Amino acid sequence: MFSLTQKIGFNAEKTACRYLQKQGLSFITKNFRYKQGEIDLIMSDQSMLVFIEVRYRRFSDFIHPVATVTPLKQRRLIKTALHYLQKHRPLDKISCRFDIVGITADRQITWIKNAIEVEY
């Protein structure tokens, strides 16, 4: 049985996935987990691998969902993505980026490409 919060999160991820597919991205997988990290969606944008964090906020008057991705969360996303790339070796040679999709209760979607900068 899933909690209400989990159901809301799943619905937000589904909404984000459909939105991104309409924008031309192709779905690869969802909810990839590694230790303390999870990547909500992994998609491809032509020849680029895209790791996507989905954020939902019921009330966004004070802070937009996108602004809730903390530096700690960013580090966890990067570590999880590196593990994904190691596990899927042919993919470790292609370009990657980290996007954030914010969704509000009124279904407003904000998509920020390259939201997290990674230095190699």
Curated annotation (Swiss-Prot):
Ranges annotated as spanning the membrane: none
Family as reported in the entry's similarity comment: Belongs to the UPF0102 family.
Source domain of life: Bacteria
One GO molecular-function entry: nucleic acid binding
Species name: Coxiella burnetii (strain RSA 493 / Nine Mile phase I)
Alphabetical list of Gene3D superfamilies matching this protein: 3.40.1350.10
Pfam family, one: UPF0102
Disulfide bonds: none
Name of protein: UPF0102 protein CBU_1742
InterPro entries (alphabetical): Restrct_endonuc-II-like, tRNA_endonuc-like_dom_sf, UPF0102_YraN-like
